[in-house]
Regions:
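Bacterial N-terminal signal peptides
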Residues: 8-18
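Flexible, processing/modification-adjacent segments and terminal tails
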Residues: 24-33, 103-113, 117-200, 206, ...
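Conserved beta-strand hairpin/beta-sheet module of binuclear metal-dependent hydrolase folds
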Residues: 303-349, 453-472
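Zn-dependent metallo-beta-lactamase
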Residues: 262-325
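Divalent-metal (often Zn2+) His-rich catalytic cores of metallo-beta-lactamase-fold enzymes
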Residues: 491-526
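Gly/Pro-enriched, hydrophobic low-complexity segments
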Residues: 179-286, 454-459, 466-467, 472-473, ...
Length: 526
């Protein structure tokens, strides 16, 4: 009898413990159903919306403390087909009245048309010049995720079988312009896991409208990086409520809080001008070239520029290795860990048995910073401009867990580095030397591309190493009618520092004689 009582008590405890979870699940479904009814989500199969606004180019701010470099979104059209799990996005960007400072192709020359598509697990771009598909297998997962980060997509995904949404309620106050509001609103937060790993949170207000959708996405520099959309100015079209304004943050919107090491956060704002509901058109067909595409392997092509100096190309971003008596220095650790581990392997092949003691980081743009953590884990001291010190030390070179795409530094953190060996900063000039060879590092003053830009110079070999300032065009390309401001600025710095340059080893493009650079900027002679 005692045993039966114990079993009954145990079963009662299990049922009692399970009851709140069941109630919570039912509450989550009730909130979702109310939102779906209010928004007309159940009748929405597809939507096409057009508008204008601006784009913030993520990871390309001029100063690390600035917001993302901004360009005008002259036109934007997106069609989402929720049943097909597909989307087509076409936009035209131009420089507009935005300051021509920062990366990502700034200053934009004329209008640039961009076309991006996703269908289920396939992603591709379309080249506007010939309308041929360009496979983007590395972008497929995040583009698929993005289908569910808008209000209707969120509701559909959260209500899908197996989503297992949970509900929490909280009071929130928000920012009003630059001021923090003290008005608190009670809001419902629905949370579920998308694509097996992305925690997606939707904020539903007292009108049963989804006003915010937030998740984290992997980034080589930031790790688990905030991605969120805020939705306002709702309108009713054929019984479907749809936001008239989209505002997206990529990275945390913490501009009112100090310290703020990275100012970038506003990545997209546009106002909807036209909206078509359930006018789905023809289904998107996945091209054969896209279906068979795979992520290409990393290739590193090594070219000897001089004794102990190696150009490490083979992709869109390059590095340069310089051999010293008992160590090696590498200029640039770009893109991501995958690229840089291949670079490290290539360095040890041509310069064996010497550790990589330094990595020179040209600037803070994410495509040139993404592999710094891998070099740091390898044991290299990072040399960068002093402007970047706090951001790198506090937010980049950390051992914090990375849950979405763990890297070596987060998985296998090294013993704490001695003070001073994590970062070495440059103000105007720094030098890496073993007493017989110098690698001089200079601050590029007045660069329109990035504040804190560095370039490297080998005085004995007369080789200049630079990133994003001068990207040599093809040998048969026509010279620009007006030289780009960044290239002119490079020449000004070469003259100011009295550098005797014979060869430029750019970190994009190809190695060129200095005379070719002079021709590019409309000068002749030496």
């Amino acid at each position: 009898m005692a045993k039966r009582i114990a079993v009954c008590v145990g079963l009662l405890a299990v049922l009692t413990a399970a009851a709140p979870a069941v109630a919570q699940a039912q509450s989550a479904q009730a909130v979702l159903q109310a939102a779906a009814k209010a928004m007309g989500t159940n009748t929405l199969r597809c939507a096409t919306y057009t508008g204008t606004g601006y784009v913030g180019i993520v990871g390309q701010n001029y100063d690390i403390r600035d917001d993302w470099a901004r360009v005008e979104l002259a036109s934007y059209t997106r069609t989402i087909n929720f049943d097909q799990k597909s989307a087509r996005e076409e936009r035209v960007i131009r420089q507009g009245s935005n300051p021509p400072r920062g990366g990502g192709g700034i200053p934009i020359q004329g209008d640039q048309r961009q076309i991006q598509l996703v269908s289920d697990r396939f992603a591709w771009n379309v080249n506007p010049a010939n309308m041929l598909p360009v496979p983007q297998p590395q972008a497929a997962e995040l583009r698929q995720l993005d289908l569910w980060l808008n209000p209707h997509g969120f509701i559909k995904a959260a209500m899908a079988p197996g989503a297992n949404p949970v509900l929490i309620t909280r009071y929130e106050s928000g920012a009003l312009g630059a001021l923090v509001s003290t008005v608190q609103r009670k809001l419902n937060i629905i949370s579920f896991t998308a694509l097996g790993k992305y925690r997606v949170n939707g904020t539903i207000n007292d009108q049963n409208l989804v006003e915010r959708v937030q998740t984290l996405v992997p980034n080589p520099v930031r790790g688990d990086m905030n991605q969120e959309g805020e939705y306002t100015q709702w309108r009713d079209v054929n019984g479907v409520k749809f936001p008239g304004n989209f505002h997206h943050h990529t990275d945390w919107d913490d501009e009112t809080q100090a310290p703020n090491y990275n100012g970038g956060h506003n990545s997209l704002t546009f106002t909807v001008k036209d909206l078509r509901i359930n006018d789905c058109g023809e289904p998107i067909a996945v091209p054969d070239a896209v279906r068979t595409a795979t992520i290409p392997p990393v290739q590193v092509q090594t070219t000897k520029l001089a004794d102990g100096v190696y150009y490490l190309a083979g992709g869109s971003h390059h590095s340069v290795a310089v051999e010293f008596r008992d160590f090696t220095a590498v200029v640039e650790a770009p893109q991501d860990e995958r690229r840089v581990l291949a670079v490290v392997e290539a360095v040890y092949k041509v310069i064996p048995n010497k550790p990589i003691r330094y990595v020179v980081n040209s600037h803070h743009h994410f495509d040139h910073l993404g592999g710094v953590r891998a070099m740091f884990h390898e044991g290299a001291t990072v040399m960068t401009h002093r402007t970047n010190r706090e951001f790198y030390k506090q937010e980049v070179l950390t051992y914090a867990p990375r849950t979405l795409e763990p890297d070596r530094l987060s998985l296998y953190p090294p013993t704490e580095f001695a003070e001073g060996y994590q970062l070495e900063t440059v103000d105007i000039r720094g030098t890496i030397s073993d007493g017989t060879r110098n690698l001089d590092v200079y601050y590029v003053q007045g660069s329109p591309h990035a504040e804190g830009m560095l370039m490297a110079y080998l005085p004995r070999e007369k080789i200049l190493i630079e990133a994003d300032i001068y990207n040599p065009p093809a040998p048969d390309a026509q010279m620009p009618a007006t030289p780009p401001p960044a290239a002119v600025n490079l020449m000004n710095n070469i003259q100011a520092y009295k550098l005797d340059v014979q060869t430029i080893a750019p970190l994009h493009g190809r190695v060129v004689p200095f005379a070719e650079f002079l021709k590019f900027i409309g000068k002749s002679g030496s």
